[in-house]
Amino acid sequence: LAEGGLVNRRDPFPGEPRWYQMTGKGLAHIGNPLPTPGVNLSEYKHDVGVAWLWLAARGGTFGPLAEIVGARRLRSLDGSRERGAEPAGVRLGGFGPHGRERLHHPDLVLRTADGRRVALELELTPKSRTRLEKILAGYAADPRFAGVVYLVESRAVARSVQAAARRLGVSDLVHLQRVRSTVSRSASKPALTAERAPGSRTRMPEAVR
């Protein structure tokens, strides 16, 4: 694939497994209309984790699904939608650059056969209180979403999400799942595995069971 120009081989960090990135030619070959993905090495761990989440969803971890949509596709849909059309992302209120309404795009959106949606957010680093509350308020105001699952690695991030959900009165909408990431420079097989926090009362939404 690399020799044919369909993917680029990359070795971003010494001692870390090589990874591959689709090229424009590769995307065209499989009929994918999305633009060539960019590279942000500061988000490497997050992006690899989301890829593992996508594979888990495709493999049935979250139950039968009609569709799995990633953030890149959501942003692409919103970038080309007509004025007045419903956005693919979650409305945050207000407008940003060029007069576009402010939107948040989940890492993954799982759609069940009956049309319900559940957002997956891989939250490896904390957001500011203001930013997090705006996102949760956006989910609460969007009737398309049956729930949002925050997959967190640290207890501090878990507490931050729980506290924000309580302040906004949306605890029933927000679900937490602890995960352990082996996406590191020493891991030969990067992965993302779920673990249940002791005493946790959170659960997956019924929409994806």
For each predicted feature, which ranges?
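A short, highly charged nucleic-acid-interacting micro-segment common to nuclease
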Residues: L34-A51
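Structural motif
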Residues: G5, T61, P143-A146
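Nuclease-adjacent, charged terminal/linker segments that flank catalytic cores
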Residues: L1-G38
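Non-catalytic C-terminal interaction segments of nucleic acid-processing enzymes
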Residues: P126-R209
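Active-site metal-binding core of divalent-cation-utilizing nuclease and nuclease-like domains
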Residues: R10, K45, R58-V118, L124-R131
